[in-house]
A protein has these predicted regions:
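Nucleic-acid endo/exonuclease domains
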Residues: 1-146
Length: 146
């Protein structure tokens, strides 16, 4: 019962005109999380071009450079409010779109490798998973504790 009431609360806050409902759910969770005092130092931007996070592309292979310059985007980028530096990237992986699509899995792998090269922390949230809010809070707490 409490599970369905939580879903109804989220559903009531959703914009039904969005392309991906899974990303809209994460957006709502981020809004809730950042209202908490311990996380109010963070802000997020949705749909950021990966290229915009990289100061330079020197570390990238030619394939990675092409990928980045071909409008590769990130679902959510969490920034520190104070200095606007990137704290965390969140990618929402829809099961149908990702698991059943070898090309998309390859793009996800390349994105992971690029984020790792530039030491940008990231969190992948599969839409067939659960406990997203807790996973996000754990990732943010790790940033605060470091």
């Amino acid at each position: 019962k409490s599970y369905s009431s939580k879903l109804n609360i989220i559903k009531s806050k959703m914009n039904n005109n969005v392309r991906y409902k899974s990303e809209e759910i994460i957006r709502i969770l981020l809004e809730e999380i950042f209202k908490e005092i311990s996380f109010n130092r963070f802000m997020y931007v949705q749909g950021v071009l990966l290229r915009n996070l990289l100061n330079d592309v020197q570390l990238l292979t030619e394939n990675e450079r092409n990928f980045v310059n071909n409008r590769a985007s990130l679902d959510f980028v969490i920034y520190y409010k104070q200095d606007k530096t990137c704290a965390l990237v969140i990618e929402v992986d829809g099961f149908e779109f990702h698991e059943n699509n070898p090309k998309q899995l390859q793009r996800d792998k390349m994105k992971n490798e690029i984020l790792n090269k530039y030491k940008i922390p990231f969190l992948r949230l599969p839409t067939n998973g659960s406990g997203e809010k807790e996973k996000i809070c754990i990732a943010l707490n790790k940033l605060i504790d470091n």
